[in-house]
UniProtKB/Swiss-Prot annotation:
Keywords: Aminoacyl-tRNA synthetase, ATP-binding, Cytoplasm, Ligase, Nucleotide-binding, Protein biosynthesis, RNA-binding. It comes from Clostridium kluyveri (strain ATCC 8527 / DSM 555 / NBRC 12016 / NCIMB 10680 / K1). This is Tyrosine--tRNA ligase. The lineage of its organism: Bacteria, Bacillati, Bacillota, Clostridia, Eubacteriales. A motif ('HIGH' region) lies at residues 40-49. Pfam families: SYY_C-terminal (PF22421), tRNA-synt_1b (PF00579).
Length: 406
């Protein structure tokens, strides 16, 4: 079996790594227990998490043992990484609900049967810490001067970094130490924005336990223009089908830029390398065939083969002018809601997050109702717009929603 390190390297996952030669040898010789942390700050995982779970799946298939660490404790503080403002504080109840939602989604990627993987929650050890003992045992190993040079803190210094958030690095380092003590975990992985936090944990274990510990970060999922992947005019792309329908999920990947096809096939599917190279090198319009394969494969991983096939058929029916709308995201509307402007309707039924987004879409000629382009943001949506009790909204070229009257 190929060394999983070489697989991750070839597919373009690895961004930074500590002790590179040791890690490659370790992953080729021994079964390693590793972890990735996920702070439950929302009630669903999103595309950014998807890449990390693909890494976990590759690692598990190679015989290594994953720990999915839910940040029930660290979410009470909020990670300042990549944020220009302090995160909204969540209640314990919200965090617990979100953690429960995450657990269901992890099982699609990771096999937890027969102790092949572990799901842990750092609330188990963080919530009852003795503060003085924590400072004496952990705080003594952290240099404030060094912490302030970390990119995650630099970005916040101008606007103000709270002491609450400043503790996040210590707590993430302590997580690694605790997982090392409890489960023999020696390897932490995460997005490249977590490099400083990961290094902190590696150094803590090496200083305090005098044991080997390692860290690796992955490429962040960005588009060819450098912007983060996974955002649309309707908001984030979620892995929960109640928040982002399988059809919308499929369409997102079907519509990626030509320049991003190869990266997405490498990072977000299990297709063999020769097939990835063949698809990503298709010339001109033929690259659309690669996008269809990408959309199908990614949707299959997240939502299963049946949902992927239904989304594919719905997209093809709409593209060819067919009339089968059964698999298009459908919203039921109370008749009493009619008579409002199209802008208000789009926001009320959660197709778009704000009226300004709706007006911008109309201004850019990106909205149609039943095939007719909408040019007036004050257009009143009435029963006359419904054909056989249905109204079809299209955003952009290929994002559809069906509205039916209850």
């Amino acid at each position: 079996m190929a060394n999983v390190y070489d697989i991750l390297l070839e597919r373009g996952y690895i961004k930074q790594i500590t002790h590179e030669d040791e890690v490659r040898e370790l992953l080729g010789k021994e079964k390693v227990t590793f972890y990735i942390g996920f702070d439950p700050t929302a009630d669903s995982l999103h595309i950014g998490h998807f890449l990390q779970m693909m890494v976990m799946s590759h690692m598990q298939k190679a015989g290594h043992k994953p720990i999915a660490l839910l940040g029930g404790g660290t979410a009470m503080i909020g990670d300042p990484t990549g944020k220009t403002d302090m995160r909204k504080m969540l209640s314990r109840e919200q965090i617990q609900h979100n953690a429960d939602c995450f657990k269901k989604q992890f099982s699609k990627f990771i096999d937890f049967e027969d102790e092949k993987a572990i799901m842990a929650n750092n609330a188990d050890w963080l919530m009852n810490l003795n503060y003085v003992n924590f400072l004496r045992e952990i705080g003594v190993h952290f240099s404030v001067n060094k912490m302030l040079t970390a990119e995650c803190f630099k970005q916040r210094m101008e606007k103000g970094l709270t002491f609450l958030e400043f503790n996040y690095m210590l707590m993430q380092g302590y997580d690694f130490l605790e997982l090392n003590r409890r489960y023999g975990c020696t390897f932490q992985m995460g997005g490249d924005d977590q490099w400083a936090n990961i290094i902190a944990g590696v150094n803590l274990i090496r200083k305090k336990e005098r044991k080997p510990a390692f860290g690796m970060t992955f490429t962040l999922l960005t588009k060819s223009d450098g912007k983060k992947m996974g955002k649309t005019e309707g908001g984030a792309i979620w892995l929960d089908k109640e928040k982002t329908s399988p059809y919308d999920f499929y369409q997102y990947w079907r519509n990626v830029d030509d320049a991003d096809v190869e990266k997405c096939l490498l990072l977000l599917t299990f297709l063999p390398m020769d097939e990835v190279k063949r698809l990503s090198s298709l010339p001109g319009e033929k690259i659309n065939e690669a996008k269809k394969v990408l959309a199908y494969e990614v949707t299959k991983i997240i939502h299963g083969e049946k949902e992927a096939q239904m989304a594919k058929e719905a997209a093809e029916a709409l593209f060819s002018g067919g009339e089968s709308l059964n698999n298009v995201p459908t919203i039921e509307l109370d008749e009493s809601s009619l008579g409002c402007s199209v802008v208000e309707l789009l926001v009320d039924i959660h197709i778009l997050p704000s009226k300004s987004e709706a007006r911008r879409l109309i201004k850019q000629n990106g909205l149609t109702i039943n095939g007719e382009k909408v040019t007036d943001s004050e257009l009143k949506v009435t029963k006359d717009h419904f054909k056989n009790g249905e109204l079809l909204i299209r955003r952009g070229k290929k994002n559809y929603n069906r509205i039916i009257i209850k």
